[in-house]
C-alpha cells in the first residue's frame, strides 16, 4: 500500500510529459508555412551569359524564417513578426532560388558560386534592405522589397543598381502579405533581368 503514492506520482508525471509533448506538437503544426509560389511564365530569351548568384547579404533580422510586417500608420520604425505564420526558408533565400530559376528560364546559364573564380567570371551579389509587408492602414498593405544588385567580373565591379518594388496585398494578413511579396519579387526579378540584358555583358 505504501508504494501506491509513488506509482501514482510516476503516472501523473508521465501524463504531464505526454500532455506537454502534445501541446508542443500542436503548436508546431499550427504554424502556417509560406513560400513564393509557382514561377510566373518564362521571360523571352534575353541572351544572358553564364553567371553565378552569390548568397544574399541580409540584415540579421531578415536572416530567419519569420514573416515580418510594419504598421507604418502607428510606428514606422518597428518591424513585427507574425505569430503563427513563417516562411519555408529565410525569404532572401527564396528570392535567390527564384532569381536563379528565372535567369535559367530566360535562356541564361546559372553556375555554382563555389566554383573556381576563373570558371565563373560573372557573379551577381545581392544586398537586401527590406522584405516586409507594410500596412499603411489596418485594412490595406503592400509587400515591399528593396535590394541592391552588384555585378562582378573576376572580382571587379562592373555595375550596380538598387531595385525597389511594391505590390498590393489582397488581404490584411500573412497570406495576403506572402502573395504580395511574391508579386513584388517577380516584378523585381523582371527589372533585374532587363537591366542585365542592357549591360551587354560578354558571353
Segments the model singles out, each with a brief description of its role:
Residues 75-88, 156-194, 201:
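Short secondary-structure boundary motifs at beta->alpha junctions and helix caps
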Residues 24-42, 105-155, 170-171:
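Surface-exposed short loop/turn segments
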Residues 1-23:
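Sec-dependent bacterial lipoprotein signal peptides
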Residues 100, 104-108, 193-201:
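Sec-exported extracytoplasmic/periplasmic mature domains
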Residues 83-107:
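Structured, soluble extracytoplasmic/luminal domains of envelope-associated proteins
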Residues 50-55, 70, 123-127, 144-150, ...:
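Soluble periplasmic/extracytoplasmic beta-strand elements of cell-envelope proteins
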Residues 23-92, 199-203:
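A structural "domain/chain start" motif
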